[in-house]
Amino acid sequence: SALVAFVAGSAPVAEQGFRIVGAHTDSPGFRIKPAPEMLSEGAYLKLNTEVYGGPILSTWFDRPLAVAGRVALKSKNPMQPQIRLLNIRRPVCIIPNIAIHMNPDANNGFTPNKQVDTLPLLSMVTQKLEEKGYLGKLIASELRVKESEILDFDLFLYEHEKGCLIGNNEEFISSARIDDLSSVHAGISAICGVARPKATCVMACFDHEEVGSSTMQGADSQLLAEVLERIVLSMKGGREEYFRALAHSYIISADGAHAVHPNKGEKADPTSRPLLNRGLVIKLSASRSYTTDAATAATFIQLCERAGAKTQRFVNRSDMRGGSTIGPISSTHVSIRSIDIGLPMLAMHSIRELCGIEDHSAMLKVIQELYQS
């Protein structure tokens, strides 16, 4: 569930190093539990789920939801189970709200119970035992396999509705999972189009950022360090060349950044106030929850100038604790100069987030500039 892409540079990697962009593939939401079928009132078939990461729960109610993930099937070699991707591209679930008449506190800070209130409705059943194995039958039908072949799955709910351009001038992107698939899209698009770079270009898409990154495919692992060393080894280099390459390298950790909210401006820092469509955001923190320093910021600003992109700054209010991202985590495994940046966005961790179309275009151009530098 992680992806690392690279393009070998024309110059020796020990002399030019790596130009790296890091992002993450996961987003907050709901994961379907094993044997998830639950029957209510002898007729409503629900799915038992658990919360993944930190979604804004209220935004998941009354939305048409689809199901996607991966399914593990039987194989001849038990050490290599057959893995199939599954995407049920239709709205098969919904988490219905309770009417305000039955929940008068709905508009007064109602906190949903994660085990009770957020279970999605899948179907109506007509027979008492019909719910047993219902999801397994659905998976088998979608993958065109026998139900007995299914051993396990990693399945998640997601919003079925597609993203769209909104605003009077269509200047905003409204979509699910902007955090952080927007950075993944920009990075993959850039590295697929790079031609004969001098330095070796790398795009690292980690999983599990929303739950701490401490997995073998997360940023808090040896994944990036091992891939970079293997690239050096494939170029007939050794450990010394690897360490020299790291010293000449640069990482852009690209993740969402908080823009000033139009209705809650007081939540932002008094002087650092990023806006949508006003440039990419350089993120800073005295606690080092972001990797940015003056030197790495100077490099990024010059890349933006070359790409014709603007920059803004984000710092948390001093009386509010902020989040972090993959930058500081990956820096503990590879000693490379690093900066944390992102698209300014609103409604982060909502089922549907908002960013500026100009900023996403700028992100792509700046990453292209990095890869050609």
Language-model features: where?
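N-terminal hydrophobic/helix-forming segments and targeting peptides
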Residues: S1-S373
